[in-house]
Amino acid sequence: TPTPAPTSTPTSGADEPADEAILAAYEKAEEAWGWFEIAPMPLNRDDQRTVGEQVYCRVDYPGIKTLADLRGYLKSLFSDGLVEELLPVDGTQYVELDGALYTIDGGRGADITKGEETVQVLRDGTPGRCTVRVTVEVLDPQQGFSVVGSETHDFLYEQVGERWIFTTFSMVR
């Protein structure tokens, strides 16, 4: 019997993460993005510093002790452009004071007109890229928060160098 010849093209998807890993990355990305739009990272409210008129509380989150730690964590989830959008160099939402990470206590909270979300991984066969599709219920407060529709958001999850990261992202709630 003939020996099969090795193929010169790798099997499509061989190095791509499983759906479960992508969904776990989406959950981490949603949490991290929320630190900027919904509520800050967990805080130690007993350790406060005032800078100008602004009161900051020390961040109390395992593994993220400095601004560099936070930036590194965000870069494990998002493209450089998205990280810069969240954490600009001259930003004031998260600051480092005496070698520790601090942030402003407060946030907008989640959107009460948004309900349950459904998350799917879509693959179109393009190597190194997939889409995370999030469908979220739209609720009407005037109708007892009943579901009156839905919104769909697509986020690209792509291989950039050795990393798999989101290159598009926003909050859905």
Where are the regions a protein language model picked out?
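Core segments of small alpha/beta cavity-forming domains
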Residues: 14-104
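Ser/Thr-rich, Proline-interspersed low-complexity disordered segments
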Residues: 1-13
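Generic marker of residues within folded, mature protein domains
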Residues: 122, 145-147
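Surface-exposed, charged secondary-structure patches
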Residues: 93-140
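Short, surface-exposed coil-to-beta transition loops
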Residues: 113-117, 147-154
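Phenylalanine-focused residue identity feature
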Residues: 8, 36, 78, 145, ...
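Short beta-strand edge/turn micro-motifs at domain boundaries
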Residues: 129-133, 143, 150-173
